[in-house]
């Protein structure tokens, strides 16, 4: 086997280091979106979850309500998601812009919600689905990226929304 000359490690140039930092930041902000949604689908929204995705003064905005501040965010989320037997959120098209210690993120989301009761007579047979656009601002903290603001805009719905479901028990 011929000898291969050893090439010593060469540190990245400042430009390469900055480019790698931007890529890592963009992935970290995308992961923040995924952590938020995974917590919803796993019904794992406790105080630790809230602090892992929101800043102390973080704000959540949705057409049907919202909440300001990490204190109480888990309870608010539990009340919002607790209406459903299960949920499944799929996000795509993440656009992330990093500006130093701040970031903006946006994308599309399809959320599928299963009604509390299985389909049956007088019960909706279909899940309730929502197509959303999301937009948020994140801040780099000592613990990593956290949402300072996260907002959703409903684009379309399909199925029976909560509050309009009427069940008749036999």
Predicted regions and their residues:
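Short beta-strand segments enriched in hydrophobic/aromatic residues
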Residues: 40, 54, 109-111, 151-154
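Short, P/G- and charge-enriched loop/turn segments at secondary-structure junctions
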Residues: 81-83, 121-126
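Transmembrane beta-barrel outer-membrane domains
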Residues: 86-87, 127-129
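A solvent-exposed, acidic/Ser-Thr-rich amphipathic alpha-helical stretch
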Residues: 46-113
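Short, low-complexity N-terminal intrinsically disordered segments enriched in polar/charged residues
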Residues: 1-46, 52
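Extracellular/periplasmic carbohydrate-active domains that bind, remodel
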Residues: 108-120, 131
